[in-house]
A protein has these predicted regions:
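Hydrophobic helix-and-loop "lid/oligomerization" segment in the mid-to-C-terminal part
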Residues: 1-48, 68, 86-87, 95, ...
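Active-site cavity-forming subdomains of large catalytic enzyme subunits
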Residues: 42-113, 117, 121-130, 140, ...
Length: 299
């Protein structure tokens, strides 16, 4: 959600809006908007809650926002929760003034497999058009939408393929001080950035801050206009990613040892207890173990 948060933050500020951005702490808050975050927004005097890359499954939390008179706008790309009534699926949608999600049953948007940052970008394009700024002005966010499309491992079909091609072209000429600093801190050359570098070098650096520290560092890197601050933040993110990789490799080794020493290798489902594993990398470890043993893995 870092790229989508940046697109909405920068895009709305460019229209004169006052924005306060909150990214849930992976450990303390869990995923997405919750009642504690809504209560904090109410106490701060916010009049609108705008979600990005989440919110479609946060009906209870957003109901609280509506009860307190806030405007609620949900932008998301995840599947819509549903229940079955009389053999038919019924969507469970949050109480919101507007929901922007191509996965909705009645949404006429032709291509459904876009990431949350692309949804956010389309919203900003429409806002720019409606306010007279001009939809073309939102093209500055194409590199961010493309970055997120690659990082979220979306299918490179239809508009995603076009977006990534154009986004890579723009990223290699980026004027973003934060992005240029991140590229330099990873000892990469501006002008030679490919999808691989986003998926396996730059993207993991942005994600590492949310796993081991706070995702706000990654967001502030994209937002900053100060070269010194950008350099410091970029170096911190590279260090966090290095730590994340070391912790992941250690976790994988411990998981493999656990399987072998406890005789789990023949189990149809692998359940592995790693008491010292950092919660935020358990999923990565489980994925790597699954690649070796070809069966469901819980860590």
């Amino acid at each position: 959600g870092v790229q989508s948060s940046y697109i909405l933050w920068e895009g709305i500020e460019n229209l004169g809006g006052k924005v306060y951005v909150t990214i849930p702490d992976r450990i303390k808050d869990g995923y997405g908007v919750n009642e504690q975050l809504v209560e904090a927004a109410i106490e701060e005097g916010a009049d609108t809650i705008l979600t990005c890359d989440n919110g479609i499954a946060a009906a209870d939390a957003l109901k609280r926002a509506k009860e307190n008179g806030l405007t609620v706008i949900v932008t998301d790309h995840h599947e819509i929760p549903f229940c079955e009534e009389n053999g038919e699926r019924k969507e469970i949608l949050p109480d919101a003034d507007a929901i922007v999600n191509p996965k909705q049953k009645d949404c006429a948007y032709p291509f459904k497999e876009i990431c949350g940052a692309v949804v956010a970008w389309h919203l900003i394009r429409v806002l720019y058009d409606m306010t007279g700024k001009g939809m073309k002005q939102a093209d500055v966010f194409i590199e961010n939408a493309a970055f997120a499309t690659i990082g979220d491992v979306m299918e490179l079909q239809h508009e995603n393929r076009i977006l990534v091609k154009e986004g890579l072209k723009r990223l290699n000429q980026t004027k973003s001080i934060g992005m240029r600093s991140l590229i330099a801190s990873n000892k990469l050359d501006l002008g030679g950035i490919k999808a691989y570098h986003i998926g396996f070098v730059l993207g993991p650096c942005l994600n590492a801050s949310g796993r081991l520290d706070t995702a706000k560092k990654a967001l502030l890197l994209l937002k900053t206009k100060d070269e010194v601050d950008a350099g410091k933040l970029a170096e911190e993110l590279v260090e966090l990613n290095t730590s994340r990789k070391a912790l992941t490799e250690k976790g994988i080794e411990d998981a493999m040892q656990c399987i072998e020493t406890q005789g789990l290798s023949e189990d149809r489902v692998l359940v592995i207890y790693l008491p010292d594993c950092h919660e935020s990398i358990a999923g990565i470890i489980a994925g790597r173990v699954r690649e070796r043993y070809h069966r469901p893995v819980y860590v």
